[in-house]
Amino acid sequence: MKNPIIAREGWLVLLAAFGAALIATWLIGWWSVPFWIWAVFALQFFRDPARVPPADADAVISPADGRIVSVEKVRDPHLERDALKISVFMNVFNVHSNKSPVDGEIKARWYTPGSFVNADLDKASTENERNALWIQSERGDVVAVQIAGLIARRILCYVRTGDRLLRGQRYGFIRFGSRVDVYLPTSARAAVSIGQKVTGGRTILARF
């Protein structure tokens, strides 16, 4: 099913924001400008443009828009293995729709409650509320972890164990600033560097 260009998660928020702005304009005229600023901000936040993933079969694509904050070899706490971890930090101006980095079947899903420290920090990976998916692809096991941030306090995930995902397929949403960690086999080769801006569903993070 094709997703609307404005994420469904934001429809009620936008209805309230623009409704309040219109009422404020009618009641207080030019003093309603802050209401309109908030409404426009909400509109850009909940945008969800269609993306066409690259055709490269060996590519692992970014699950989110944002900035690379980590590229390192670590211990994957979900599959108890050594792994290459690539982390994408999303600020409040990024698209917050989350997309599958690979084609594959969901073998497990783990939800962990936690705190809400700044998602730009490494400790967010282990301390914050998070939702992890183990995606088994033909080229290797991938774990994608949605992590709540300082402002984001709601992780939405619409898939379950046994579902199949296509690379670039939308599977979740995190409201406001947050982070996604991707754990890959150590044989994967990173294609991004720290500080690089990436586009969800389009930028290649690594190759198998």
Curated annotation (Swiss-Prot):
One of its GO terms (cellular component) is plasma membrane. Keywords: Cell membrane, Decarboxylase, Lipid biosynthesis, Lipid metabolism, Lyase, Membrane, Phospholipid biosynthesis, Phospholipid metabolism, Pyruvate, Zymogen. It catalyses: a 1,2-diacyl-sn-glycero-3-phospho-L-serine + H(+) = a 1,2-diacyl-sn-glycero-3-phosphoethanolamine + CO2. The keyword Lyase applies. It is found in: Cell membrane. It comes from the Bacteria. GO terms for biological process: phosphatidylethanolamine biosynthetic process. Its cofactor is pyruvate. The active site is at S178. PANTHER family: ARCHAETIDYLSERINE DECARBOXYLASE PROENZYME-RELATED (PTHR35809:SF1). Heterodimer of a large membrane-associated beta subunit and a small pyruvoyl-containing alpha subunit. Belongs to the phosphatidylserine decarboxylase family. PSD-A subfamily. This is Phosphatidylserine decarboxylase proenzyme. It comes from Thiobacillus denitrificans (strain ATCC 25259 / T1).
